[in-house]
Amino acid sequence: MDIVSVALQRYSTKAFDPSKKLTAEEADKIKTLLQYSPSSTNSQPWHFIVASTEEGKARVAKSAAGNYTFNERKMLDASHVVVFCAKTAMDDAWLERVVDQEDADGRFATPEAKAANDKGRRFFADMHRVSLKDDHQWMAKQVYLNVGNFLLGVAAMGLDAVPIEGFDAEVLDAEFGLKEKGYTSLVVVPVGHHSVEDFNAGLPKSRLPLETTLTEV
């Protein structure tokens, strides 16, 4: 199936079949999707929590209490639930970790090439954390790049998913001690197979016309 067909067929799943689980191979593949998403300057300012056990999913679903109970069953019934987290600070230690990993992976022919790459990344990091002081927004944008990549990727695998912002981030952050680890939760994405009760599965997709959202020059 080509990528456009995948985009046309995927949708936000409203109900999951709790009896249908991802295979071990599928579970490994979704982790690979998370790992290899693009990000600005390859900064990768993220962390993921993947819940597949009943206990793990219940911990994530605590964040759906109160005003967000309508999302609780999605988190409990899906085979896997992914919590997308962003770093709360783009620190020098992280930048060093990224460039050292790139070096270990063989991306630099010379030490000078490594230094130039590191300098370029730090230019943009400093632009956001020092000049613009919007590094939190910048890092969140990278996480959302990952979410979009992930949604299309799991759809290409024949899996169903839904991006959820309707949850209590403070509850979720506290449950997993994210603040202490330098992260905050942004999006929760349950993944699995839709239920026969999923009303959204049979509805036509709706998007604004290109004449409204696209300009060609």
UniProtKB/Swiss-Prot annotation:
EC number: 1.-.-.-
GO process annotations (BP): 2,4,6-trinitrotoluene catabolic process
Molecular functions per Gene Ontology: oxidoreductase activity
Enzyme class: oxidoreductase
Pfam families: Nitroreductase
InterPro entries attached to this UniProt entry: NfsB-like, Nitroreductase, Nitroreductase-like, Nitroreductase/BluB
Gene3D superfamilies: NADH Oxidase
Highest taxon above the source species: Bacteria
One term under GO cellular component: cytosol
Residues reported to bind NAD(+): 14, 41, 71, 74, 107
Cofactor(s) listed: FMN
Annotated TM spans: none
Binding-site list for FMN: 10-14, 71, 165-166, 205-207
Keywords, alphabetical: Flavoprotein, FMN, NAD, NADP, Oxidoreductase
PANTHER family: NADPH NITROREDUCTASE, OXYGEN-INSENSITIVE NAD(P)H NITROREDUCTASE
Assembly, per entry: Homodimer.
Function description: Reduction of a variety of nitroaromatic compounds using NADH (and to lesser extent NADPH) as source of reducing equivalents; two electrons are transferred. Capable of reducing nitrofurazone.
Family statement: Belongs to the nitroreductase family.
Full protein name: Oxygen-insensitive NAD(P)H nitroreductase
Gene: nfsB
